[in-house]
Amino acid sequence: MKIAVIGQSLFGREVYRELLKEGHQVVGVFTIPDKNGKADPLGADAEKDGIPVFKFPRWRVKGQAIPEVVEKYKALEAELNVLPFCSQFIPMEVIDCPKHGSIIYHPSILPRHRGASAINWTLMQGDKIGGFTVFWADDGLDTGDILLQRQCEVLPDDTVNTIYNRFLFPEGVKGMVEAVRLIAEGNAPRIKQPTEGATYDPMQKKENAKINWDQPAEDIHNFIRGNDKVPGAWTVVDDQQLTFFGSSFTRNGPAPDGQPLEIPGASRPALVTKTGLVLFGNDGERLTVKNIQFEDGKMIPASQYFKTADSAALQLSEEEQKVSEEIRAAWRRILTNVSEIEDSTDFFKAGAASMDVVRLVEEVKLKCNGLQLQNEDVYMATKFEEFIQMVVRRMRGEDGEEELVIDYVEKEINNMTVKIPHQLFINGQFMDAEGGKSYDTINPTDGTAICKVSLAQISDIDRAVAAAKEAFENGEWGKMNPRDRGRLLYRLADLMEEHQEELATIESIDSGAVYTLALKTHVGMSIQTFRYFAGWCDKIQGRTIPINQARPNRNLTFTRREPIGVCGIVIPWNYPLMMLAWKTAACLTAGNTVVLKPAQVTPLTALKFAELSVKAGIPKGVINILPGAGSLIGQRLSDHPDVRKIGFTGSTPIGKQIMKSCAVSNVKKVSLELGGKSPLIIFHDCDLDKAVRMGMSSVFFNKGENCIAAGRLFLEESIHDEFVKRVVEEVKKMKIGDPLDRSTDHGPQNHKAHLDKLIEYCQTGVKEGGKLVYGGKQVERPGFFFEPTIFTDVTDEMFIAKEESFGPVMIISKFNDGDIDGVLKRANDSEFGLASGVFTKDINKALYVSEKLQAGTVFVNTYNKTDVAAPFGGFKQSGFGKDLGEEALNEYLKTKAVTIEY
């Protein structure tokens, strides 16, 4: 189609570019005249492409079209006019001229907010839904028939800039292109605008952007954000006009400490605090503004209002002087109307506009090795000298957010360079433990030290809890929209996937996990877990509940599902990353902050995870990782008054101690995933080949270091001998070796103390009369390797029949053919109830057994088949509470009932 593009701005330019990509012929571009010698982006692009560009200062005089302007337009013979953003009045002779007429982009859901300040009014009136309309132009003001509309959620702290950049700009470009496509195909609708809900809102200008303080805080917040950045909501303090930017609304809660600032007309003094300027409405609620701009254009952080001028000017190095001159040249290119850029030259007073801010930020990024400034930084340093000082401080790392500094341990292993953090991770930074205390973490494959790891002390634990508490109560995490929190968790999962091979390699050398298993399960399921729970972030919701009415009044009761606060998580060594993911993903999804203690013997993937969390944009203090002794860290977290929840996976005796400490300290919420002795019942009518294969997996998976491992196999007598024979044959085929070798089936046990316990466990089994059919001893090679082991003739009173080995030890007992209730009684005769399994082709038998088994998980004709969507957790002394699935969220949420009478 032959199209005339009429408009201006970056938005107009992007629509123009996309129309060319679609194959349309742009016959002409009509834009505004150059300003201070600078062409509008739309016109500049079209001129480069050789498209005819017209820069009429006006199309009409005294309400009448200028004939020569109209003739120049008509000569192009356009079939459609596209007006992506146009500040000029276009005569109807031009609007109606093309075959298909004209379409216009408008940034509101028409008929609401007609007029030139639609985005401002969407926010000022507190609309929950925003969006844009592409409509057919007519002789009214934004009254033409609707072609298409797109909606978006308006976030509580959205400003004109944020909603524009997040949705109205990118989706608006797509919407304009789609509208043209529909017209070209002959499918474009014409829907009459409804009269109901129609509004026309006047244009927002500086003179009518003065704040009215006699209204609720939320209305003041909406007014400020609705005028952010243009024209800027303002008030007068000490005979000086102050303009406010970056408002956030805080409902309820005590006001923070701060220095009072009297504001004429306000219900109470504002407070200058470390987080910004706290303002109050006439309802006593509060809002906080981040930045203040003075009449001369200078912007400062609101928290700095009472502070003295910046410290003495920096002395620039020779290299920094070169950067300064390059930036001076960039200012000169932007401010073409200024003959010389002096140190005192003010960017905005010299004629710069908001579009020039974007350009300057990009120029600095190009000249300063990717240094990323924000638009606000330009407003806060408007004079050239101030701007250079700010840029140099950023380049030196003296200003802005603290840079993440990591003292990596680097290893050339598994055909890659592995970079491993080894310090405590507290409040978004890696740091040494108090006193520089550390310990060696050991590679179980050969018994050598991988690296020194910081050993957390009491003061470190308290510092981490304080950081988590601050992040929860005052940080961005607690204010964040749940959907935005989900985006961060998705990003974290993506980064874990990008580093999957590195994480799996670290897991292999630190825990002994076979690399191929680490890729699929240890790391792969961790990624799946974060993705699954990221999707839950914006789906946590309460209920409305019918209650008896207090007649003649009425009542409404609803529930809120709220995060608990600071959560302590203590995880075991068998799946170091996966156990972190199972608990932490649900915890973060619910909106909590976390202090996590990895197992002392396997801390490295947790620390690598901490690094990735920073790169994903998780705010500081939300995640804290403390390697060290469980007796110190776990106990302190259980006792700490600011920790409100403990999630623990580990042994039953330690779980009991944690539960006791949580009760005595502050009655913390607790979830426990403890020991197991999971029974696997195999009936004679099973698929024996599958039962042998899955039976081996149930015991030897991950070297037996598996909380749900089948701790005891009950075999129906008629298949006992054949089953044992086949299992022994298959075990002999298993390759024991280096976990990084892709052909290895069975790697080393996790650590030396565990290996010694396995040796002792098997010696006890032999002493009590168990028949050691295979294995039972350490492999004669360096490292902590233990042979896959098989015991038969194990009777119910034996130690190995009751206690879990947590290793590759298969315990086999017989039961009489057909004695279903008898074997169920034996299987349930345990204080544990984590998992269980049954193999049979008889569906009635399978359902009966699954009903009667006293375990949190029952596998039928399979084993180890866990999934991120299925709840996981035990009965009896295997603990309580669930990991995974929707139920896991309950462990990290509290329910509040709210009853209203009206």
UniProtKB/Swiss-Prot annotation:
Gene3D superfamilies for this protein: ACP-like, Aldehyde Dehydrogenase, Chain A, domain 1, Aldehyde Dehydrogenase, Chain A, domain 2, Formyl transferase, C-terminal domain, Formyl transferase, N-terminal domain
Give site residues, Essential for catalytic activity.
D142
Instruction: Tell me what PTMs the record reports for this protein.
Output: Phosphopantetheinylation at Ser-354 by AASDHPPT is required for the formyltetrahydrofolate dehydrogenase activity.
**Domain Carrier span(s) in chain numbering:** 318-395
EC number(s) on file: 1.5.1.6
Q: Where is it found, in Gene Ontology cellular component terms?
A: cytosol
Q: Name one GO molecular function term.
A: aldehyde dehydrogenase (NAD+) activity
Q: Which residues form the active site?
A: H106 (proton donor), E673 (proton acceptor), C707 (proton donor)
Question: Binding positions for (6R)-10-formyltetrahydrofolate?
Answer: Q88, F89, I90, D142
Which region ranges are annotated with the description Aldehyde dehydrogenase domain? 417-902
Task: Assign the protein's first listed, main location to one coarse class.
Answer: cytoplasm
Q: Where in the cell is it found?
A: Cytoplasm, Cytosol
Q: What are the UniProt keywords, alphabetically?
A: Cytoplasm, NADP, One-carbon metabolism, Oxidoreductase, Phosphopantetheine, Phosphoprotein
What's the superkingdom here? Eukaryota
- List residues modified as O-(pantetheine 4'-phosphoryl)serine: S354
InterPro entries registered for this protein in UniProt: 10_FTHF_DH, ACP-like_sf, Ald_DH/histidinol_DH, Ald_DH_C, Ald_DH_CS_CYS, Ald_DH_CS_GLU, Ald_DH_N, Aldehyde_DH_dom
Q: Where does NADP(+) bind?
A: 571-573, 597-600, 630-635, 650-651, 673-674, 757, 804-806
Q: What does this protein do?
A: Cytosolic 10-formyltetrahydrofolate dehydrogenase that catalyzes the NADP(+)-dependent conversion of 10-formyltetrahydrofolate to tetrahydrofolate and carbon dioxide. May also have an NADP(+)-dependent aldehyde dehydrogenase activity towards formaldehyde, acetaldehyde, propionaldehyde, and benzaldehyde.
What UniProt notes about the protein's domains is: The N-terminal hydrolase domain has an NADP-independent formyltetrahydrofolate hydrolase activity, releasing formate and tetrahydrofolate. The C-terminal aldehyde dehydrogenase domain has an NADP-dependent dehydrogenase activity. It catalyzes the oxidation of formate, released by the hydrolysis of formyltetrahydrofolate, into CO2.
Subunit and interaction comment: Homotetramer.
Q: Which family does it belong to?
A: In the N-terminal section; belongs to the GART family.
Protein name, entry field:
Cytosolic 10-formyltetrahydrofolate dehydrogenase
Lineage runs: Eukaryota, Metazoa, Chordata, Craniata, Vertebrata
The gene from which this protein is expressed is aldh1l1
